[in-house]
C-alpha cells in the first residue's frame, strides 16, 4: 500500500472522510495502521492517558519526541503528525521552528499546533521551513486554564465568529488541515464549507471532512471518557480479566504448563 502523504489528505477534502486516531508507541501504531487509519496523531494527550498527568500542560518536548520516534519505528502507511507541546512554539518563532524540526527528525511527517490567528506568524515560519502544519481551533486543551476549563466552544455568537475567523487565518497561513474540537456542529459545518483545506472534528459534529478520537477512549481503557467520545471496546475489562486469570493460574500451579518450559540434558539423563 502506498504511503499516505499531505497531498493525499488534501485530495480527500469533500470526497472521502478522513480517519485520524492517536497512538503513542510502536505496538499500537502497528495495530491502528493495520486497521487502515489515514492519520496517526502522536498527541500530547499522551501526558494524560499514558503518563497520568492532570492535563497536557506538563508535557515536554522530550516526552513527545520519545513517543514520535516510537510510532515512526512502526513505519505506518498512515501520515504521522506530532503534537507540539505547551510552550514549545509560543516563546519565539526561532524556538518553534527548531522544535518542529526536531519532531520531523524524530519521524513525524507534520506537526499540530493549537491556536488561532495569534499563531499565524509561527505557522508561516514553519511552512517556510518546509514543515507541514495541522491547525487546531475551538477547544484548545493547552489553554484550558485561560478558557475556564474544558467547555463547549462556539455556542455564543462572538465565540463562533472568532473560531470561524481563526480557521480562515490558519488556511491563509498555510496549514494543510484543521482540527476543530468541542465546537458547535453548525459552526464546524460552516468552517468546513468556507475553507479549502480538510477539517477534522473531535466533538464537533458529523459535518467535518474527518474525525479524530483518542485511542484510549475508543478502546475503553478508562471507565470515564469525554462526552463526545465513543467506546468501541471494553479493553479495560479484557485486561483486568486476563491478568486475573493469569494470577489465578500461577497461584494454583496451572501456569506454566509443560509446553512452556524445558529441562537440561542432566534431567534427561536421569530418565
Swiss-Prot record:
UniProt GO cellular component terms: cytoplasm
Swiss-Prot/TrEMBL catalytic activity: 3-methyl-2-oxobutanoate + (6R)-5,10-methylene-5,6,7,8-tetrahydrofolate + H2O = 2-dehydropantoate + (6S)-5,6,7,8-tetrahydrofolate
InterPro entries documented for this protein: Pantoate_hydroxy_MeTrfase, Pyrv/PenolPyrv_kinase-like_dom, Pyrv_kinase-like_dom_sf
EC number: 2.1.2.11
Subcellular location: Cytoplasm
Origin: domain of life: Archaea
CDD domains: KPHMT-like
Stated name of the protein: 3-methyl-2-oxobutanoate hydroxymethyltransferase
Native organism: Staphylothermus marinus (strain ATCC 43588 / DSM 3639 / JCM 9404 / F1)
Gene: panB
Amino acid at each position: 500500500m502506498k504511503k499516505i502523504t499531505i497531498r493525499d489528505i488534501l485530495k480527500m477534502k469533500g470526497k472521502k472522510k478522513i480517519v485520524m486516531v492517536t497512538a503513542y508507541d510502536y505496538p499500537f501504531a502497528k495495530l491502528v495502521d493495520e486497521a487502515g487509519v489515514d492519520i496517526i496523531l502522536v498527541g500530547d494527550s499522551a501526558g494524560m492517558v499514558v503518563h497520568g498527568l492532570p492535563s497536557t500542560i506538563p508535557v515536554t518536548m522530550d516526552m513527545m519526541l520519545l513517543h514520535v520516534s516510537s510510532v515512526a519505528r512502526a513505519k505506518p502507511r498512515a501520515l504521522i503528525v506530532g503534537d507540539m507541546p505547551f510552550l514549545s512554539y509560543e516563546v519565539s518563532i526561532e524556538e518553534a521552528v527548531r522544535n518542529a524540526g526536531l519532531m520531523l527528525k524524530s519521524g513525524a511527517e507534520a506537526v499540530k499546533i493549537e491556536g488561532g490567528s495569534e499563531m499565524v506568524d509561527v505557522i508561516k515560519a514553519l511552512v517556510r521551513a518546509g514543515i507541514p502544519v495541522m491547525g487546531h481551533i475551538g477547544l484548545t486543551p493547552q489553554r484550558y486554564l485561560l478558557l475556564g476549563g474544558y467547555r463547549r466552544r462556539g455556542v455564543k455568537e462572538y465565540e463562533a465568529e472568532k473560531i470561524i475567523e481563526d480557521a480562515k487565518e490558519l488556511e491563509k497561513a498555510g496549514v494543510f488541515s484543521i482540527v476543530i474540537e468541542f465546537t458547535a456542529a453548525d459552526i464546524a459545518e460552516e468552517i468546513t464549507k468556507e475553507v479549502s483545506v480538510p477539517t477534522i472534528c473531535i466533538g464537533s459534529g458529523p459535518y467535518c471532512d474527518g474525525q479524530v478520537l483518542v485511542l484510549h477512549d475508543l478502546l475503553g481503557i478508562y471507565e470515564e471518557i469525554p462526552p463526545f467520545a465513543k467506546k468501541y471496546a471494553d479493553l479495560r475489562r479484557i485486561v483486568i480479566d486476563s491478568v486475573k486469570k493469569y494470577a489465578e493460574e500461577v497461584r494454583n500451579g496451572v501456569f506454566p504448563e509443560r509446553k512452556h518450559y524445558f529441562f537440561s540434558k542432566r534431567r534427561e539423563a536421569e530418565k
